[in-house]
C-alpha cells in the first residue's frame, strides 16, 4: 500500500518488472512516497537492454510524461553501477530476458514485491516464475488476470487478500474506473444488473 502510519509500516523492497508507461508512473508514485514511511522502496527495475545509451533513454522517459508533466525532482544516471538515481533513491537497472535470469539477493533485495507491468504473463503459472527468483516474496500483475487469480481493486475488495495469496492482479483500468462507483451505488441502493461501456485506447488485449 502507498498509505500507512510511518510508525507501523515496515519497508518493503519493490521491483518493477518492465518499465513501460505503467512502470514509469508506478516509479513516480513510489519515489514520491519514499521517506514518508509509506512502506515501499523501489530497489530495481528489470528490462531487456535495447541499445547503447539505454540507461539515459529510460531516465529521460521517466523525467517526462505528456499527461503528468515533468518529474518532481532530480534524475541522474549512474553508468558505472547501471542505475538510475531519482531524488536520491538508488534504483538498480537489471538487464534480463526472463525471470529465471535474476537473483535479486545478489543486489541486496530481499522479500520483495515484484510488480509485473509487462503484460507478458497474465495467469498464475506464468507469473509464478517470479516467485522462483531468490529474494521475491509476492507478485502483483498490472493487468486483468486469467484463471482463478484474484483481481483486486483497492477500496473495494482489498480485504479479500489473504496471506497465502502470493500472486494477485490489480485488475483492468475499466474495472478500477467503474467498480468504486458501483460499490457506492450497491452499498446504498443495491445494483441488480447493469451495462457498462468503455472507450479504450488501442491495446493488444
Name the predicted role of every residue range.
Residues 1-203:
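N-terminal Rossmann-like NAD(P) cofactor-binding subdomain of oxidoreductases
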Amino acid at each position: 500500500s502507498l498509505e500507512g502510519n510511518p510508525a507501523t509500516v515496515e519497508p518493503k523492497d519493490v521491483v518493477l518488472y518492465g518499465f513501460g508507461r505503467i512502470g514509469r508512473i508506478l516509479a513516480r508514485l513510489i519515489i514520491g512516497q519514499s521517506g514518508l514511511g509509506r512502506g515501499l522502496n523501489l530497489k530495481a527495475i528489470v528490462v531487456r537492454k535495447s541499445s547503447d545509451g539505454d540507461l539515459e533513454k529510460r531516465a529521460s522517459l521517466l523525467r517526462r510524461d505528456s499527461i503528468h508533466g515533468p518529474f518532481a525532482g532530480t534524475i541522474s544516471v549512474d553508468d558505472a553501477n547501471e542505475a538510475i538515481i531519482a531524488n536520491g533513491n538508488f534504483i538498480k537497472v537489471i538487464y534480463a530476458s526472463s525471470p529465471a535470469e535474476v537473483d535479486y539477493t545478489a543486489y541486496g533485495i530481499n522479500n520483495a514485491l515484484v510488480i509485473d507491468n509487462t503484460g507478458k504473463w497474465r495467469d498464475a503459472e506464468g507469473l509464478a516464475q517470479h516467485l522462483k527468483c531468490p529474494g521475491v516474496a509476492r507478485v502483483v500483475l498490472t493487468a486483468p488476470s486469467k484463471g482463478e487469480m484474484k483481481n483486486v481493486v483497492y477500496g473495494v475488495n482489498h480485504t479479500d487478500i489473504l496471506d497465502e495469496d502470493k500472486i494477485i492482479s490489480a485488475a483492468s483500468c475499466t474495472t478500477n474506473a467503474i467498480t468504486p462507483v458501483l460499490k457506492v451505488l450497491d452499498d446504498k441502493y443495491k445494483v441488480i444488473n447493469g451495462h457498462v461501456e468503455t472507450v479504450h485506447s488501442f491495446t493488444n488485449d
